[in-house]
Amino acid sequence: METSAPAPALEKKEAKSGLLEDSSFPDPGKKACPLAVAAAVAAHGVPQQLLPAFHAPLPIDMRHQEGRYHYDPHSVHSVHGPPTLSGSPVISDISLIRLSPHPAGPGESPFSAHHPYVNPHMEHYLRSVHSSPTLSMISAARGLSPADVAHEHLKERGLFSLAAPGTNPSDYYHQMTLMASHPTPYGDLLMQSGGAASAPHLHDYLNPVDASRFSSPRVTPRLSRKRALSISPLSDASLDLQRMIRTSPNSLVAYINNSRSSSAASGSYGHLSAGALSPAFTFPHPINPVAYQQILSQQRGLGSAFGHTPPLIQPSPTFLAQQPMTLTSISTMPTQLSSSSSNCLNDANQNKQNSESAVSSTVNPITIHKRSKVKTEAEGLRPASPLGLTQEQLADLKEDLDRDDCKQEAEVVIYETNCHWADCTKEYDTQEQLVHHINNEHIHGEKKEFVCRWQACTREQKPFKAQYMLVVHMRRHTGEKPHKCTFEGCSKAYSRLENLKTHLRSHTGEKPYVCEHEGCNKAFSNASDRAKHQNRTHSNEKPYICKIPGCTKRYTDPSSLRKHVKTVHGPDAHVTKKQRNDVHVRAPLLKENGDNEASAEPGGRGPEESVEASSTSHTVEDCLHIKAIKTESSGLCQSSPGAQSSCSSEPSPLGSAPNNDSGMEMPGTGPGSLGDLTALADTCPGADTSALAAPSTGGLQLRKHMSTVHRFEQLKREKLKSLKDSCSWAGPAPHTRNTKLPPLPVNGSVLENFNNTGGGGPAGLLPSQRLPELTEVTMLSQLQERRDSSTSTMSSAYTVSRRSSGISPYFSSRRSSEASPLGGLRPHNASSADSYDPISTDASRRSSEASQCSGGGPGLLNLTPAQQYNLRAKYAAATGGPPPTPLPGLDRVSLRTRLALLDAPERALPGACPHPLGPRRGSDGPTYSHGHGHGYAGAAPAFPHEGPNSSTRRASDPVRRPDPLILPRVQRFHSTHNMNPGSLPPCADRRGLHVQSHPSVDSNLTRNAYSPRPPSINENVVMEAVAAGVDGPGLECDLGLVEDELVLPDDVVQYIKAHTGGTLDDGIRQGYPTEGTGFPENSKLPSPGLQGHRRLAAADSNMGPSAPGLGGCQLSYSPSSNLNKSNMPVQWNEVSSGTVDALPTQVKPPPFPHSNLAVVQQKPAFGQYPGYNPQSVQSSSGGLDSTQPHLQLRGAPSASRGSYTQQPRQPAAGSQCLGMSAAMSPQASYSQAHPQLSPNIVSGSLNQFSPSCSNMAAKPSHLGLPQQMEVVPNATIMNGHQREHGVPNSSLAAVSQPHPVLSYPQQDSYQQGSNLLSSHQPGFMESQQNAGFGLMQPRPPLEPNTASRHRGVRSGQQQLYARTTGQAMVTSANQETAEAMPKGPAGTMVSLAPQPSQDTGRAQDQNTLYYYGQIHMYEQNGGCPAVQPQPPQPQACSDSIQPEPLPSPGVNQVSSTVDSQLLEPPQIDFDAIMDDGDHSSLFSGALSPTLLHNLSQNSSRLTTPRNSLTLPSIPAGISNMAVGDMSSMLTSLAEESKFLNMMT
């Protein structure tokens, strides 16, 4: 899968590539006039505001004035360099620059705007995972979005500087790209004069006032060379250090400006970003006003810390949107650096801390903060992060490090003014005087002996080989650092010239050392960094062991060991060469992380360059692998990746796997600081890795190494503790530092002992009264940057593999069973973290490891959007984070409803974890209990969809008003397809949506019972309505939402207008097209998303017609409540999950064969079928094999979904309302050219219609096809032939109206349903003794034969209710279009829903014609005047039955069925998958035969189930069916993401 993002960037770049070429830019060596440049740029349409970016810099230093710098005239290598240059992370990924303009919100970075066609999650995922490793690592390391990384890459090359404040990011990137691709070295541009005046708007801190402020103008090194050529005319040989030292014994400073800024071995540019442009070239992000003021107020104090970074690099789009807590930290970070750490810092060391901060122009402030180094004389130094060597590099590194002996010495930051040379007690006022004294009197006094005689020197007077070594060594004692960085804004100084050279690479961008590991393209500014990276990333060896007695630290490289010894054990605890070279490896020890290895000293050369030389590997690994934040001295200040400094004596809860890359063993237990947890938790697999670091190799490594449950539980425990400490509303909590909270069923955790404790696992340890508090805190932690599936904004279409179910609300992958060692028998998702986010690297097959127990409290997933919003607001208020995004329609909700919804959950908890959940997929193992009493697995709480009146709806489904359908409750069993009269289990009413007009059979149920499954928006809508109208549990209410609560996304409205003649019917907007609006022949309301909730809660699929007289018409209700996909907020990747609703076998085969109403084509004329002759049935040419799923038009009196249900083997469960089951015969041979369903394809006879169903004339609604497939609504067929209950009437068949394109001779042949369907496929209807009064309620199947399980039947298919005895079916459910059908003009498979009957007495033939398990062909007929309703039979609820609420298109999903013989039949929800947006690109053609033809009997991702239906191809514009290819799905993400974002 290749991202589509680079293409637009490339095209735009190429389109603009001629800009500079044609603009008379100077040749190398010439200097272009600023006016000429401006004119040239303006001539090409480049906004003038970009011109300030072309600073005319002042001369950099004397080298430029003397002309000793020779600039490489060749161009910056274009987008992708030669293979040998693949290691260069600089230009190779410029193609990923996001060039399209994005309007930036008032408070967000211009780069934070989402790509118009790519969801931000998707963008991060695609850009990072599918870009080169280098880009990914850099992106993750620096906390930048891919676009920011590209920006930084260019910045590293010194290709640009600050853009004017109002610069459009798109134009800015255009400029950068052009500059990168143009052959002229833009260093010349930087040489122009007047640079300071070009940015008058900038603060003086940002203005180029000093020549040294500018980075080297050299555009790029010779990328083809491993080591770049020296940029100085001097060669190595010409630089005589001995001569320099002897000539100027006091210092080498005089030679710095005249010497090379990098050696010949310097190579490519520095790991920290060559962009390290000084503040003059700041990042053009809009800066948070507060943070900006803080930075300006600390110009010089913190200037060094941000010397090469913009005042504040705003986080990437998802970082802003998803990381409220971290964002808060960032916005206050400068203050934290200076004040929060005040307990560890003093003013004297402020600059030192800053100078030791990561000197990276691309380092995210979080990382910078994390790496801030505190060096004080009185306090221990901050621990350094270990960086490692590969075993192969040990020898080379050893040689490198031993080049001079002084390297092995730990360096102390001191300022000595008194001489402690042996027998010398002189005192001086300044350090310079002391240095002069030592060099002249002591060192040069002993011409032949180079021995340090400083008192207490650890070398013990071991002589040096050369005098310069002694001179350098003495700097350890005096604290002299003569080698200062000459770049403006950088206050780095080093005692060793080599360290300075290494540091300068961070400014110049040289990275000559490329990782030698195959497939890794990372480059580093020094060999030590590369060795550390290789050992940390590609190896796990830690050969360097601290020899200090009692210390068991192990490190991957000597520099980390030195750092550790120096900072932890003190400067005098010298690391001897023996210690350094000891490579005997001891067994890794999991212990406390004594020193924060993340802020490692990257520069292998010398301790003082610890952070400067740090490379991109450090940024990644430091950000992602800091498992513990603990210093071995309580006085030490430890900053965290969350940009919050904290001093902690305990390690972070994030333990580390043995293979962690931190360079040392990380602690496995112990809480850390809130700041640490803030970022770490957000980068955990369950969370958005786009938060702290863009998804990248680093993120993958993080997940790989931190995926154990233990770490997650520790993390959440600590975060929970911190939140409880900081949030008063969370309830009092012990404030002791070492409080150990038991594991909670929180995001990313699995109660390991759940199987053994039977629901009383670790969570059970908590007092029951405390559990709600803890749960609420947990919910808050989840809410801080998570949205539940009900508000998911991400599509997982591109995760069409089996690991795609990362978005799945139930479990994230086929490995989901790993997440449920709990042994539950029903799927359920209590974790919002793994509900979606496919784009993050976390949405993998492993993400299911973050499963949770099914109970434990009113979890986040139990809340309505309003309640979640309320919690988010509380959380933000408690943590100081930004307020949550207001709900889309909350302001329109009535006050009463709003007040009711905003109440925090106060439900009684059924238990800590009442029952575990089981694998989501049938392939993960049987998860159905057939014998636990009523079919419930133990004490497992009923799911929301098990409540009779609740139902799920995808988050993307627009909120629609439900009809005030008052339906009786039905008893749901674990295996629900058979309906028996009975009462609901106490927990059946999960959501408490008692929508009844008659006494409730379970009025004692609590309305707010805990549900382990995330409430869909549909449920939330109903809950909101209930909250507005119900005063107590068990009360009956009308589900009709007030009109102003209906919220339709703008694009949906526009779409509807576009396809309905520009007018949006009010009835449609309300979800209720009036009967009179009956959709005309060509009227197509294509927006599946519009069609209403996925089974609005009131019309829960689980509610069988339990009202007296309703039962007779239930058509093959065989959905399993257990794996009820339609009840799940199915995400895109449900498609690939291959799950199917396992429908247990029917109680008994009915005596009658299951005849199907032949679905035949009729003229598009919509409602006039009074005279259809039942004998004109089209017979299927091949008949339907008994093993073949058949379309079952479930038209019951209230056929909420007369649906073509794929029922592989459904014993006829009775003769009542067999449901017009249209068998789709795959053998049907029909002309592909005709986009209509051939009568041959679907043929059969509605054989068994109960009297209550006799009125059900299956009227065709206009499918999205040019010729709509229609079921003949012949009243005579319905009534005349089905007069007798339970008598198979083969004559009942939908007749085929002549169609111009029918190419099948057998148009008039009468076909018995028995011919089409063998007796092996008896209808699942159970015969009822009462024609109209039998209550159908699900009963556990009597025979567990999987072969007879229903495949396509979904619980989503509402029970069919007769509004009145003789009335045609009233199915407002019909108002949903098949979501699998695109919303194109001819693309709606369903011509929109039948209008709910406003008059309960009116006959309403609104039958949704579903091809259930495969493609939902919704047949909806407004009113069919020709239908002759049978005289109404007395029914208890004839008048109270309202049309069922509009089910969302997701109700009946086309599911990828697995072998009907073997697997538990889960289903893939095509409806939900195709739920929103114009997915025309997602479908290869309406009901493309290629999709449905020759399908495997095994689960086939997006392909529909087995060969049950072959349909003619549709013209290109009418693509309706999903094609299982990744590319088409990716292209559809634009609409999907756009719509989802609008919905959320």
UniProtKB/Swiss-Prot annotation:
Biased composition annotated in UniProt, kind: Polar residues: 790-800, 805-814, 997-1009, 1173-1190, 1200-1209
Disruption phenotype: Full embryonic lethality. Homozygous embryos are detected at the expected Mendelian rate up to about 18.5 dpc, but there are no live pups. Mutant embryos present important craniofacial defects, including defects of the medial portion of the frontal and parietal skull bones, absence of upper and/or lower incisors, often combined with a cleft palate. Besides, mutant embryos show defects in the ossification of skeletal bones and shortened limb bones.
Keywords tagged on the record: Acetylation, Activator, Cell projection, Cilium, Cytoplasm, Developmental protein, DNA-binding, Metal-binding, Nucleus, Phosphoprotein, Repeat, Repressor, Transcription, Transcription regulation, Zinc, Zinc-finger
GO cellular component terms listed in the entry, alphabetical order: axoneme; centrosome; ciliary basal body; ciliary tip; cilium; cytoplasm; cytosol; GLI-SUFU complex
Biased composition (Basic and acidic residues): 569-585, 954-963
Residues the record lists as Phosphothreonine modifications: T708
InterPro entries cross-referenced by the UniProt entry: GLI-like, Znf-C2H2_ZIC1-5/GLI1-3-like, Znf_C2H2_sf, Znf_C2H2_type
Gene3D superfamilies recorded: Classic Zinc Finger
Post-translational modification summary for this protein: Phosphorylated in vitro by ULK3. Phosphorylated by DYRK2; this inhibits GLI2 transcription factor activity and promotes proteasomal degradation of GLI2. Acetylation at Lys-740 inhibits Hh target gene expression, probably by impeding entry into chromatin thus preventing promoter occupancy.
ZnF C2H2-type: positions: 417-444, 455-477, 483-507, 513-538, 544-569
Record localization: Nucleus; Cytoplasm; Cell projection, Cilium
Residue numbers carrying Phosphoserine: S145, S230, S232, S238, S385, S707, S997
Main localisation: nucleus
Keyword Signal part of the UniProt annotation: no
Recorded superkingdom: Eukaryota
Membrane spanning residue stretches: none
Extent of Low complexity compositional bias: 637-657
BP terms from Gene Ontology: anatomical structure formation involved in morphogenesis; anterior/posterior pattern specification; axon guidance; branching morphogenesis of an epithelial tube; cell differentiation; cell population proliferation; cerebellar cortex morphogenesis; chondrocyte differentiation
Modified positions (N6-acetyllysine) in chain numbering: K740
Sequence segments annotated as region (Disordered): 1-26, 338-364, 557-619, 635-682, 781-800, 805-861, 908-963, 995-1016, 1166-1220, 1422-1457
Single Gene Ontology MF annotation: zinc ion binding
UniProt remark on domains: The N-terminal domain confers transcriptional repressor activity, while the C-terminal domain mediates transcriptional activation.
Family: Belongs to the GLI C2H2-type zinc-finger protein family.
Subunit and partners: Interacts with ZIC1 and ZIC2. Interacts with STK36. Interacts with SUFU; this inhibits transcriptional activation mediated by GLI2. Interacts (via C-terminal internal region) with FOXC1 (via N-terminus); this interaction is direct and increases GLI2 DNA-binding and transcriptional activity through a smoothened (SMO)-independent Hedgehog (Hh) signaling pathway.
Purpose of the protein: Functions as a transcription regulator in the hedgehog (Hh) pathway. Functions as a transcriptional activator. May also function as transcriptional repressor. Requires STK36 for full transcriptional activator activity. Binds to the DNA sequence 5'-GAACCACCCA-3' which is part of the TRE-2S regulatory element. Is involved in the smoothened (SHH) signaling pathway. Required for normal skeleton development.
Protein name (database record): Zinc finger protein GLI2
Organism expressing this protein natively: Mus musculus
Organismal lineage: Eukaryota, Metazoa, Chordata, Craniata, Vertebrata
